[in-house]
Each structure stands twice: as C-alpha cells, then as structure tokens.
C-alpha cells in the first residue's frame, strides 16, 4: 500500500512540475493572444485555413502591450500577435523573455491626430502633444514629430524627450499609456496614436491623421512564439496562415484604406 501511495505521489509530482511553457508538438489547439484591432480581425481570416488542417484556434484579446508577452513566456498562450519588432527586441532584452518572432504580417503607421488643429502648420507655440510611454513607441513617436518638422532629435534608436535638440515651438511632450491616447484628444493640442487604438476610437488614419508615418516603416507587426516552439508543425502552420493570400487580400481590401499595409 505504501508502495502504491509512493508511486501515485511521484506521478502527481511529475505532473505538477511540468513547465508551464511546455506544449506538445502534436497539439492541435492554438491559443493566440492579440490586441483587438486589427490583429483579432486578421487572425479570424487565418483561422479557417488552420481549421482545414485539423487545428482549433482560440483567440484571447488583451488591451495592453505588457500582458501578452508575459502570458506567452509562461506558457498560457501558444503565440501572440500584437507587437512590432523593435518593441519585441526591447522586451526580450529587458525582461529576459525566451520568445522570438516567426512571421511579419502588417505595418500600422503611427499618426498625429488632433481635435484642435487641422494641419501641422497650425500647431501653436507651447502646444501639448501626447505620445506613448513605452520606450520603443515613445522613440517612434518622437521621430514622427521630427519628420513633421516640429522638433529635432539626436540620432539613436530609443531616444526620449531628453534627446530633443531643437524645439522651436516649445512643444510639451506628455507621455501616457498607448491605449489612453485617443481619450486625450479633448485635452491636448495633438496626440501621436498607434493605428490599432486610433481605429478602435473611430478614427480613420488615412483621413483623420494630420501627419502619418511613412509606409516603409521598419515597425512590422509580427507573430511571436516561444523559441522552443519555432520548429513545431502548429507554429509553422500558423505562420503560413497569417502570410497567406487570403490574409493579404483582406489587409489590402479592408485595412489598407484605414492606413494598414501588409508586410509580406
């Protein structure tokens, strides 16, 4: 009896200590974390292609840029799809995540929006301009403001407001969580907003932005997985589906008019 109890205890212990990130190579269930727009819509186009191959797809939506990488790294997700490459690189470096991108899908140009002015030239001296507060999008927003001729910034990747070298209009930079930026438009002169959050707020980047990032932006949004899973069949199938002709057609016809372009 003691021997039986000992074997049961050992079996339970082995089950308990299976790493959260372990994911069977023949697992037919794909759990993908996304932010709502346009990532969820894109995955919904890819899902039927995966279902034809015998996979089931569960989409989990997040409203921030932090939790999806935590959930992927700890094994709660099979993959995530919400971030661009520089943001991923920064997260891997600083949080020591064991994750990597496997496919580029689309580009969401960053735009400058305003309810107070209709053009960059109308932005007054002393204007308050809100930007994302995460390091990569913060630097990206400053480059958009520089491209618009409002400021000049030092060379480098992760620049901050402290790196502004010329600010002729004495613009005040306000740093906020990216998801909050559309709600700041009533209180700021302008805000630099990620396309996904702009569209969720009812804005149309191609029409409503008073300045927008170039379409050759290096900030492609990517499919991200744990490094240990890169060669697994389900991951390769997911990457193939997100780079399929069906997804490209959807982006070209439904999303490009809103400012989103394919990256494959």
Regions found by a protein language model. Name each.
Residues 26-37, 55-61, 128-129:
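Short, well-ordered beta-strand elements
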Residues 29-46, 63-67, 84:
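Extracytoplasmic "Venus flytrap"
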Residues 59-70, 157-183:
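Short helix-initiation/N-cap motifs at beta->coil->alpha
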Residues 73-83, 127, 150, 169-172, ...:
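Alpha-to-beta junction loops
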Residues 90-102, 117, 187, 192, ...:
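Ligand-binding "clamshell"
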Residues 102-151, 248:
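A conserved helix-loop-strand patch within extracytoplasmic ligand-binding domains
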Residues 109-120, 220-232:
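A bilobed periplasmic-binding-protein/Venus flytrap-type ligand-binding module shared by bacterial periplasmic
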Residues 137-146, 242-262:
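Periplasmic-binding protein-like
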């Amino acid at each position: 009896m003691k021997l039986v109890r000992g074997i049961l205890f050992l079996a339970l212990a082995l089950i308990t200590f299976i790493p959260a990130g372990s994911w069977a190579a023949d697992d037919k269930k794909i759990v993908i974390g996304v932010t709502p727009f346009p990532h969820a819509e894109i995955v919904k186009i890819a899902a039927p292609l995966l279902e034809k191959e015998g996979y089931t797809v569960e989409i989990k939506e997040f409203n921030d840029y932090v939790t999806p990488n935590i959930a992927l790294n700890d094994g709660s997700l099979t993959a995530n799809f919400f971030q661009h490459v520089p943001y991923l690189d920064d997260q891997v470096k600083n949080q020591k995540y064991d994750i990597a991108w496997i496919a580029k899908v689309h580009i969401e140009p960053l735009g400058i929006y305003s309810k107070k002015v209709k053009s960059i030239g109308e932005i007054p001296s002393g204007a308050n301009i809100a930007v994302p507060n995460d390091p990569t999008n913060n630097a990206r927003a400053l480059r958009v403001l520089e491209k618009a001729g409002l400021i000049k910034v030092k060379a480098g990747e992760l620049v901050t407001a402290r790196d502004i070298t010329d600010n002729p209009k004495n613009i005040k930079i306000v740093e906020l969580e990216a998801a909050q930026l559309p709600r700041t438009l009533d209180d700021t002169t302008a805000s630099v907003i990620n396309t996904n959050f702009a569209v969720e707020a009812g804005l149309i980047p191609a029409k409503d932005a008073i300045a927008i990032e170039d379409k050759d932006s290096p900030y492609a949004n990517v499919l991200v997985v744990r490094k240990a899973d890169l060669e697994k069949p389900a991951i390769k199938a997911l990457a193939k589906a997100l780079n399929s002709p069906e997804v490209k057609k959807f982006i070209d016809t439904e999303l490009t008019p809103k400012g989103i372009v394919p990256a494959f």
